[in-house]
From Swiss-Prot:
Pfam short name (any one): Ribosomal_L28
Keywords: Ribonucleoprotein, Ribosomal protein
SUPFAM superfamilies registered for this protein in UniProt: L28p-like (SSF143800)
UniProt GO MF annotations: structural constituent of ribosome
Assigned protein family: Belongs to the bacterial ribosomal protein bL28 family.
Membrane-spanning ranges: none
Positions of the UniProt region annotated as Disordered: 1-28
Keyword GTP-binding on entry: no
InterPro entries assigned to the protein according to its UniProt record, in alphabetical order: Ribosomal_bL28, Ribosomal_bL28/bL31-like_sf, Ribosomal_bL28_bact-type, Ribosomal_bL28_sf
Name of the protein: Large ribosomal subunit protein bL28B
GO-annotated cellular components: ribonucleoprotein complex; ribosome
Gene name for this UniProt entry: rpmB2
Taxonomy of the source species: Bacteria, Bacillati, Actinomycetota, Actinomycetes, Mycobacteriales
Residues annotated as signal peptide: none
Gene3D superfamilies for this protein: Ribosomal protein L28/L24
Length: 78
């Protein structure tokens, strides 16, 4: 499972970890990605989305139907 939110488009951030002695090593900051299953009443079926915590809040605020409509308008296959 890739660390990519289908709703918000959030991806990992990349940078450096800096130790006490200032040695820099590569690291990445992963978004809080969850696999969530939602029921689409208009289609009578469930869909599974890979969403971040902010994406879950967006779905709670706007509704799953509106979010799925935006995803399909963007060309994403659901």
């Amino acid at each position: 499972m890739s660390a990519h939110c289908q709703v918000t488009g959030r991806k990992p951030g990349f940078g450096k970890s800096v130790s006490h002695s200032h040695v820099r090593t590569n690291r990445r900051w992963d978004p809080n990605i969850q696999r969530k299953t939602y029921y689409l009443p208009s289609e009578g079926r469930r869909i599974t989305l890979t969403v971040s915590a902010k994406g879950i809040k967006t779905i709670d605020r706007d509704g799953i139907e509106a979010v799925v409509a935006r995803l399909r308008a963007r060309g994403e296959k659901i």
